[in-house]
């Protein structure tokens, strides 16, 4: 997605925020909403990684960890970052059985990647590498800042819309307040999804280039989708506005390209990756390498 389109989408979310502010407090409310939206963008610029990681219950994995699987995981991420020409990101783990992962940070120099314990336990080493290469692609494409700012505004719009029901009666009437309360979060969600869904395809392609085998990511996506259907991610459930940051929707496992899906269809993503593998002369399921005999087996 181009920079111009990203700014357009973020401007649309700010406009929604301002419209609700007008309903709640007239012109003064609209101006205040604009100031708050601008402040949230500035806050997200400097604190996006800390905010998201804290809300998702992520714990940093230090290089000297005694856990052999986590140590190998960190080494693999560092190797992938080197392949991509990126600084090694900080690495975090989220204690939840649902397999998933995300990246955050305002730029490659301040990036962080996080994986769930479910991801490391359910996927083999090549598949984990494919997932982390995808997340590093988001870092390289500088998607992480945009996605975090979008999540912040989307969550704030939902909360502000709820206030409209109680404070906007005199200005727009009860019916208008209810309409804003319903449709403003929906509009914010559509903007959020438009950002997420288009970027996932780009990150899939670049991630496959970083790890060297599109089939690793294709296989991982299929396993992650199955895991998302059967396992709950309590951190994502508590902050659904951040669902689009994960590699696969942590709130549901539906595989259709529906209007209110935060991610493209897994089947479509896998098909594109398999097509890419064919163009690279890679066929079948990649056999485990010698390094895969470690923690992942």
UniProtKB/Swiss-Prot annotation:
Tell me which EC number(s) this protein carries: 3.4.24.-
GO terms of biological process kind: proteolysis
Q: Which UniProt keywords apply?
A: Cell inner membrane, Cell membrane, Hydrolase, Membrane, Metal-binding, Metalloprotease, Protease, Transmembrane, Transmembrane helix, Zinc
According to its UniProt record, where is this protein located?
Cell inner membrane
Name the enzyme's class.
Answer: hydrolase
Question: Any one cellular component term from GO for this entry?
Answer: plasma membrane
Source species, domain of life: Bacteria
Tell me which residues bind Zn(2+). Answer: 134, 138, 200
Please give the start and end residues of each transmembrane region: 16-36, 147-167, 175-195
Mind listing the GO molecular function terms for this protein?
Answer: metalloendopeptidase activity; zinc ion binding
Stored Pfam families = Peptidase_M48
Topology in the lipid bilayer: Multi-pass membrane protein
Q: Which cofactor does it need?
A: Zn(2+)
**Which residues act catalytically here?**
135
Cofactor binding comment, as recorded: Binds 1 zinc ion per subunit.
Q: Which HAMAP family match?
A: Pept_M48_protease_HtpX
* Homology family: Belongs to the peptidase M48B family.
What protein name applies here? Protease HtpX homolog
Task: Give the species this sequence originates from.
Answer: Hyphomonas neptunium (strain ATCC 15444)
């Amino acid at each position: 997605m181009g920079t111009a389109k990203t700014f357009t989408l973020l401007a649309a979310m700010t406009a929604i925020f301002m419209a609700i502010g007008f309903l709640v407090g007239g012109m003064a409310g609209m101006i205040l909403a604009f100031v708050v939206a601008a402040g949230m963008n500035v806050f997200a610029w400097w604190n996006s990684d800390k905010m998201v990681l804290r809300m998702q219950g992520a714990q940093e994995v230090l290089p000297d960890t005694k856990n052999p699987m986590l140590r190998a995981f960190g080494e693999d991420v560092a190797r992938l970052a080197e392949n991509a020409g990126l600084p090694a990101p900080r690495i975090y783990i989220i204690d939840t059985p649902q397999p998933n992962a995300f990246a955050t940070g305002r730029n490659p120099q301040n990036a962080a990647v996080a994986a769930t314990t479910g991801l490391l336990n359910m996927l083999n080493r090549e598949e984990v590498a494919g997932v982390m290469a995808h997340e590093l692609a988001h870092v390289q494409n500088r998607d992480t800042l945009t996605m975090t700012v979008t999540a912040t505004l989307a969550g704030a719009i939902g909360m502000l819309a709820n206030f409209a029901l109680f404070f906007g009666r005199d200005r727009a009437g009860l019916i208008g307040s209810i309409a804003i309360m319903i449709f403003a979060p929906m509009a914010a969600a559509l903007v959020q999804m438009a950002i997420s869904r288009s970027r996932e395809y780009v990150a899939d392609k670049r991630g496959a280039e970083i790890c060297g085998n599109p089939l690793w990511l294709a296989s991982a996506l299929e396993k992650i989708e199955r895991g998302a259907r059967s396992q709950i991610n309590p951190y994502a459930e508590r902050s659904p506005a951040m669902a689009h940051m994960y590699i696969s929707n942590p709130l549901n496992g539906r595989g259709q390209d529906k209007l209110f899906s935060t991610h493209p269809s897994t089947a479509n993503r896998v098909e594109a990756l398999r097509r890419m593998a064919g163009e690279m002369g890679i066929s079948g399921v990649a056999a485990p390498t010698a390094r895969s005999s470690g923690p992942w087996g």
